[in-house]
Amino acid sequence: MVTTAPNLDALDSQPMISLRNLRVSYGAREILHGITFDVQRGETLVILGGSGSGKSTLLRTLVGLEKPTSGEIWIKGKNLATISPEEMDDIRKKLGMSFQGSALFGSMTVGENVALPLREHTKLEESTIEIMVRLKLEQVGLEGFEYYRPSELSGGMKKRAAVARAMVMDPEILFFDEPSAGLDPIIAAGIDQLILELKQAFKMTIIVVTHELASAYLIADRMVLIDKGNVVAMGSTTEMRSSTQPRVRQFLDRVAEPEVARELDYLQMLTEDRRVDRNAAKRERA
């Protein structure tokens, strides 16, 4: 019997992730309204959006924590809605997720946290797991920290430990949810640099959800802006910076919504009125 070898060029050119008219609802309320875009192999895509834009729901749907109401998610050329449970398990093993709050278990050491996916999803010997844990911690700059507790780590070190755990299964796709949240600018810059180094070293496809523009400009190959559950714009950092779309400009230039601006004006007016009243009271007492 003659078999045909897979077309490696076609596989390389195929998007790593494709979303087609993806919709997600919570009860009667639709959160994502027909999201469609591709994520190419080896690229870093940053998903931007304000609070309540739907970007976190999109990320949770991509990693399987939310089920779409309709539409399609394709990963590595496979439609997640039609594959077998065994194929789904294989795909999940190719995904790594670093959560916003690090999500480390306080009752475990750092090494035990990193080892958890290996112990849950593989039959590797403990000696092999220990070697892999040390290797991953070294790759994120935490060599020698395997016996520390999460409570003994700084915020930036917790983020790095979470990245090590996300990487321990050697994923092809790595997801980050607000990797710079809660970090001071210097530590946040270190996490950005780590993401760049991981991409360079392991050629992974990386998807980052953030609202930190400085971080997005540094790490992104492309950006997609989500607003009210819709894709507003998508392009390279250069294309996004030069966009004239009003919603893109509003987000990138950090212009408040009209309703928010009116609230701020009202608060400013109240503050000024109170300041005038206090000054008048001081003059009367004098």
Predicted regions and their residues:
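Helix-to-loop junction immediately C-terminal to a conserved catalytic motif
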Residues: 63
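Conserved ABC ATPase "signature" region
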Residues: 78-79, 126-144
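Conserved ABC ATPase signature
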Residues: 149-153, 157
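A short, proline-enriched helix->beta-strand linker immediately N-terminal to the Walker B motif
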Residues: 168-172
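Catalytic Walker B motif of ABC-type/P-loop ATPase nucleotide-binding domains
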Residues: 174-177
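A short, surface-exposed alpha-helical micro-motif characterized by mixed small hydrophobic
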Residues: 216-218
